[in-house]
Amino acid sequence: MRTYQVNVTRDDRWWMVAVPGLTGYVTSDGAINMSDTTQARRLSEVRRQAIDFICTVTDVAPSEVQVNITIDVDGIDVTAEAKKIAHNRELAKRHATAAQTEARDLARRLAKHGVAVRDVGDVLGVSFQRAQQLISA
């Protein structure tokens, strides 16, 4: 299995899909590939278009091809920023889970010490109904 770098840019209403590894590729019959670019109308089509293009030029099965896609729009490194956003969302999810666990634990401890449910809600910044749910969970 071979991994190809795929560089995607925007050109008017099209996504230009460049596969630098295909420039000058020599086929089994000696033909030289002169182009490294195809296009896609939608970003969701890029992976499939790139793999189809690579398979057509190299005459290999799609199962033998992997692609590493980078997207750049007028100097915006879309790939890097999207990865950063995904990472931050994952961190936020973990922090939210930890905060939920800590809130539940604190609510239970306060309730065991006789603190009123409404006061537990005030401490945690939630309604008394939510405080009761945390205590009961």
Task: List each model region and its residues.
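DNA-contacting interfaces and partner/effector-binding or oligomerization modules
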Residues: M1-Q66
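Short basic helix-loop element that most often maps to the first helix and adjoining turn
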Residues: V6, A107-A116
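Generic anion/oxyanion-binding catalytic loop in active/binding sites
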Residues: S35-D36, A96, R109
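Short, mixed-charge low-complexity intrinsically disordered segments
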Residues: P62-E81
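Short, Lys/Arg-enriched anionic-surface-contact patches
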Residues: T79-D105
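DNA major-groove recognition helix of helix-turn-helix
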Residues: A111, L124, I135-S136
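Short alpha-helical "recognition helix" segments of helix-turn-helix
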Residues: A116-L124, A131
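Major-groove recognition helix of helix-turn-helix-like DNA-binding domains
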Residues: Q129-A137
